[in-house]
Structure formats: structure tokens, C-alpha cells
From Swiss-Prot:
Subunit architecture: Homotetramer; composed of two disulfide-linked dimers held together by non-covalent interactions. May interact with matrix protein 1.
Primary location class: virion
Record-given protein name: Matrix protein 2
Positions in the Intravirion compartment: 44-97
InterPro entries for the chain: Flu_M2
Membrane topology, Virion surface segments: 1-22
Site (Essential for channel activity, possibly by being protonated during channel activation, and by forming the channel gate and the selective filter): 37
Source organism of this protein record: Influenza A virus (strain A/Swine/29/1937 H1N1)
Keywords: Disulfide bond, Glycoprotein, Host cell membrane, Host membrane, Host-virus interaction, Hydrogen ion transport, Inhibition of host autophagy by virus, Ion channel, Ion transport, Lipoprotein, Membrane, Palmitate, Phosphoprotein, Signal-anchor, Transmembrane, Transmembrane helix, Transport, Viral ion channel, Virion
Site-annotated residues for Seems to be involved in pH gating: 41
Subcellular location: Virion membrane; Host apical cell membrane
Ways its activity is controlled: The M2 protein from most influenza A strains is inhibited by amantadine and rimantadine, resulting in viral uncoating incapacity. Emergence of amantadine-resistant variants is usually rapid.
GO CC list: host cell plasma membrane; membrane; virion membrane
């Protein structure tokens, strides 16, 4: 005897969703939130390179130099460059023959 004959199968009208005719505001809010979440997730997956690249490089620009005299800007650049030059000593140069 087959297992399929032993399993009860639901009748046709039990397959439908029972919450369609419900006017509960909680159900409506959950549906709206679910749809918005799905839309945002799809947009995130489509444009994640643009979004995260902008966030990553947008935060690394450094302080604004607006309104700062050019001499002070140059001094700041030299300090930043000297800090980078000091860090270069920690790396090992490997020369290939």
C-alpha cells in the first residue's frame, strides 16, 4: 500500500489565505511593512556598489578646507604626507630578479 493513500489531503477551499477578508489594522500594517522591506532589499541589492562606495569614500574625504588660507592648507598637506612617509618604514620591499 502506498504512503500517498494514507495521507490526508486538504480540500480545495482550505488552500486559500484566511486573512484576505480580515480588516484588522495590524494585518494591513504588517503587509505594508513587508512590501516596503522587500522593495528596499531589492534596491539595496541592485545598487549596493553605488551606495556603499559613496558611504565609504564620502567619509574618508577629511576635514573641510573651506575658508582656510592656502598656507595653512599646504602645511596640513605636508603634515599628512610626513605621517604617511613615517609609515613607509614598516613595509618590507621585495625585489624580484
Amino acid at each position: 500500500m502506498s504512503l500517498l493513500t494514507e495521507v490526508e489531503t486538504p480540500i480545495r477551499n482550505e488552500w486559500g489565505c484566511r486573512c484576505n477578508d480580515s480588516s484588522d489594522p495590524l494585518v494591513a500594517a504588517a503587509s505594508i511593512i513587508g512590501i516596503l522591506h522587500l522593495i528596499l532589499w531589492i534596491l539595496d541589492r541592485l545598487f549596493f556598489k553605488c551606495i556603499y562606495r559613496r558611504l565609504e569614500y564620502g567619509l574618508k574625504r577629511g576635514p573641510s578646507t573651506e575658508g582656510v588660507p592656502e598656507s595653512m592648507r599646504e602645511e596640513y598637506r605636508q603634515k599628512q604626507q610626513s605621517a604617511v612617509d613615517v609609515d613607509d618604514g614598516h613595509f618590507v620591499n621585495i625585489e624580484l630578479e
